[in-house]
Amino acid sequence: MTMREEIEAAAARYPDRRSAIMPALMIAQKEHGHLPGPVLEEVAQILGVERVWVYELATFYTLFHTEPIGRFHLQLCDNVSCMLCGSEALLTHLETTLGIRKGETTPDGAFTLSTVECLGACEMAPVMQVGDDYHGNLDAARLDALLESFRAAERVTSVERAAAAPGE
């Protein structure tokens, strides 16, 4: 199914097509990896809504990305509960370990580091979201283990891609 068909199918579930902007953005981001201007315009055109409505949602919610992000998007909560449990020190640790600052992506494109206002998981503070998964009760050692597991997954994926490459 094409992106247009998926968006049309999602929009059919709503009485007002404006209500379908969020699911349409999710579909478009899954297809393109992020939501640059032309993709936002395409979503608005498919839904028949004002571009500003699409742009407002795409730039308000932290789950949408208008710029490319790394294969692993590390979103560290920096709200009160997580701060009280050490998220500031964990942010510094991640910046030092990865050699990037908040808002940046590693040169190899593997990791993007962000902070988010609240992940709604205060019971396991400090917490970080990576993709759809939450990782809680974090400390520097757990972060290092997580980063290594992500790097190991990257190595496996790279080997699989190389093995699947035609003519090699």
From Swiss-Prot:
A molecular-function term among this protein's GO annotations: quinone binding
CDD domains according to UniProt: TRX_Fd_NuoE
Coiled-coil residue spans: none
Top EC class, one word: translocase
PROSITE patterns to which the protein is assigned, alphabetical: COMPLEX1_24K
Keyword tags: 2Fe-2S, Iron, Iron-sulfur, Metal-binding, NAD, Plasmid, Quinone, Translocase, Ubiquinone
EC identifiers of the protein: 7.1.1.-
KW Translocase (keyword) present: yes
Annotated InterPro entries: NuoE-like (IPR002023), NuoE_dom (IPR042128), NuoE_N (IPR041921), Thioredoxin-like_sf (IPR036249)
Family matches, as Pfam families: 2Fe-2S_thioredx
The record's free-text note on cofactor binding: Binds 1 [2Fe-2S] cluster.
Binding site for [2Fe-2S] cluster: C77, C82, C118, C122
Catalyses which reaction(s): a quinone + NADH + 5 H(+)(in) = a quinol + NAD(+) + 4 H(+)(out)
Cofactor(s) needed for function: [2Fe-2S] cluster
Family: Belongs to the complex I 24 kDa subunit family.
Xref: NCBIfam families: nuoE_fam (TIGR01958), PRK07539.1-2 (NF005722)
PANTHER family attached to this UniProt entry: NADH DEHYDROGENASE [UBIQUINONE] FLAVOPROTEIN 2, MITOCHONDRIAL, NADH DEHYDROGENASE UBIQUINONE FLAVOPROTEIN 2, MITOCHONDRIAL
Function: NDH-1 shuttles electrons from NADH, via FMN and iron-sulfur (Fe-S) centers, to quinones in the respiratory chain. The immediate electron acceptor for the enzyme in this species is believed to be ubiquinone. Couples the redox reaction to proton translocation (for every two electrons transferred, four hydrogen ions are translocated across the cytoplasmic membrane), and thus conserves the redox energy in a proton gradient.
The protein's name: NADH-quinone oxidoreductase subunit E 2
Native source species: Rhizobium meliloti (strain 1021)
UniProt gene name: nuoE2
